[in-house]
Regions:
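Loop-centered beta-sheet repeat module
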Residues: 172-261
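An N-terminal, globular interaction/scaffold subdomain
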Residues: 2-153
């Protein structure tokens, strides 16, 4: 296996994160103290929240389409959809891909209002609804249809994205220009896909499925990373290829996370299933190294930064504090998931644990700790990775 292939494999994410946890338990990390004794209480809390949210424990898989449902309004269930199964899959894949890529942290001040949904929306739900409405209006289509094609994406500017997302001086969205640039890059990449549409990714993925319609989650992730790696031109390179969400960490080498691409992989499982493709080995994917899961561990008392002034400092994604935090998040959520399963007496998948779950618990603790529910660590993000 080449170095690039190894760094795109979820087993490498898990293995490197376990190595980071080993350093933490030995007291050898520069930026964090760890208290594993807090994990059981946190496991019970996540279990209790999961029971409240899903009393029958029929927990759906973590995925973007759940953010299209706000209160009694379910945009996903009522979306425009072609009658042909494969064409419907292309439509769904296009929507999911563009919405996930626009899902990096919005910042604490941004809000979105929708005519059908009461109240102001923010963060993931706000970004989801905003991207859905833009898709519905044909913002991402050269034909004015609710689809996503290369030609339209290649021309997306910051102004048009700002208009679609209701961005103003008093309603700033983190990284609006960078998000627009990301969509333009997606336009260039998807020009090589079938039909020059983002939905053509469905055809590429279905080509990797077996004759019985089975597709390994490892293959799903690898294919996504191979196709989407040009979207992150400023990332670390190996063998002439951009690695994306992979960061140097001298004590352990390169640390891969692929948070946004794994979030996309989780989010595509249901649309692929509806098209007759069963994604297998889903638990080979890892917990997502993002600020809700990671914030749960800080606000829950498992992790404590040791650097004075860490709360008031903006930390780059490449910083030791953030790289250590994200790796510990992956390894510790794996352990937390086992405690949640024991508490519930149910063998939920990792995707169900995240949904049930750790993401919601992280948001709840953040809201209790800080008025705007912002994450405990201020990460300097450009809105395209974290």
């Amino acid at each position: 296996m080449s170095e690039v292939a190894r760094l795109r494999h979820p087993d490498t994410i898990r293995r490197q994160s376990e190595r980071m946890l080993a350093l933490a338990t030995q007291g050898r990390l520069e930026m964090w103290d760890i208290n594993l004794g807090r994990l059981p209480d946190l496991g019970r809390m996540v279990g209790e929240l999961t029971r409240v949210r899903y009393p029958d424990l029929a927990v759906p898989m973590h995925g973007r389409r759940l953010h299209f449902r706000v209160g009694d309004v379910d945009l996903w269930e009522n979306r425009p959809r072609p009658a042909d199964r494969d064409e419907a899959a292309r439509s769904d894949v296009g929507l999911i891909v563009v919405s996930v890529l626009l899902d990096a942290g919005s910042g604490p001040r941004w809000r979105y209002t929708d005519t059908e949904i009461q109240g102001e929306l923010s963060r993931s739900e706000g970004l989801a609804v905003a991207s859905f409405r833009a898709w519905e209006r044909g913002v991402f289509s050269s034909r004015g249809l609710p689809r996503v094609d290369s030609e339209a994406l290649s021309g997306v500017g910051a102004a048009s994205l700002a208009q679609a997302f209701q961005v103003r001086e008093d309603n700033p969205l983190v990284g609006t220009e960078d998000r627009a640039a990301l969509l333009r890059s997606l336009g260039r990449v998807s020009s090589r896909w079938p039909s020059q549409r983002v939905g053509g990714l469905f055809d590429l993925l279905s080509g990797h499925a077996s004759s019985t319609g089975r597709l390994s989650a490892v293959t799903l992730l690898r294919t996504l990373l191979e196709q989407l790696s040009p979207l992150w031109p400023d990332s670390t390179m190996r063998d002439g290829q951009h690695l994306g969400d992979v960061w140097p960490y001298p004590p352990l080498g390169l640390m891969p996370f692929h948070k946004l691409t794994q979030w996309l992989a989780y989010s595509l499982i249901e649309p692929l299933h509806a098209a007759g493709i069963t994604v297998t080995e889903v638990d080979r994917l890892t917990p997502l190294a993002e600020y809700r899961n990671g914030g749960l561990l800080i606000d829950g008392g498992v992790l404590t930064p040791v650097t004075p002034g860490w709360r008031t400092t903006s930390h780059p994604l490449s910083s030791s504090l953030v790289v250590e935090w994200r790796a510990l998040t992956v390894a510790l959520v794996v352990r937390l998931a086992e405690l949640v399963r024991e508490d519930l007496g149910a063998r939920l998948s990792m995707a169900q644990i995240l949904e049930g779950g750790t993401w919601a618990a992280g948001r709840r603790l953040a809201a209790a700790a800080r008025p705007d529910a912002r994450p405990p660590v201020n990460v300097a993000s450009n809105g395209t990775i974290f």
